[in-house]
Amino acid sequence: MVEWTDAERTAILGLWGKLNIDEIGPQALSRCLIVYPWTQRYFATFGNLSSPAAIMGNPKVAAHGRTVMGGLERAIKNMDNIKNTYAALSVMHSEKLHVDPDNFKLLADCITVCAAMKFGQAGFNADIQEAWQKFLAVVVSALCRQYH
């Protein structure tokens, strides 16, 4: 089990409270699909992913980005039990969707980049980043649990 300091909880919950999941989710997933084009193979049913403009304008990408952020909200609400909270999601991504677990880290990094761009140094300083990335590392670990 992960131990969270009061400062980490405050930083994570404070950042989460400022994030607009309808904005950050689509941006982060779009960025992931553009920067790491091999991740597109998991989204064959999403239609046109042929260019950055097509990806950024794709409503299915945007909707799934919001879904991803909804999943993060579940982790936020269950910070002391993320692994169990994500158990079924880990099984689904491993056994049904066959997602390469390395891609979870790539998407987490894209979420971090989008948050940093949105809030800049004032709203996303090193202390906030440290706590946020610890949180996302726990989420990624929970998603990868079924793969071990």
Swiss-Prot record:
Keyword annotations from UniProtKB, A to Z: Heme, Iron, Metal-binding, Oxygen transport, Transport
Function according to Swiss-Prot or TrEMBL: Involved in oxygen transport from gills to the various peripheral tissues.
A Gene Ontology term for the protein's cellular component: hemoglobin complex
Domain Globin: 3-148
Quaternary structure, from the entry: Heterotetramer of two alpha chains and two beta chains.
Gene3D superfamilies xref list: Globins (1.10.490.10)
Molecular function per GO: heme binding; metal ion binding; oxygen binding; oxygen carrier activity
Official protein name in the record: Hemoglobin subunit beta-2
Binding-site list for heme b: 64, 93
GO terms, biological process: cellular oxidant detoxification; hemopoiesis; hydrogen peroxide catabolic process; oxygen transport
Similarity annotation: Belongs to the globin family.
Source taxonomy: Eukaryota, Metazoa, Chordata, Craniata, Vertebrata
Expression tissues: Red blood cells.
Endpoints of the signal sequence: none
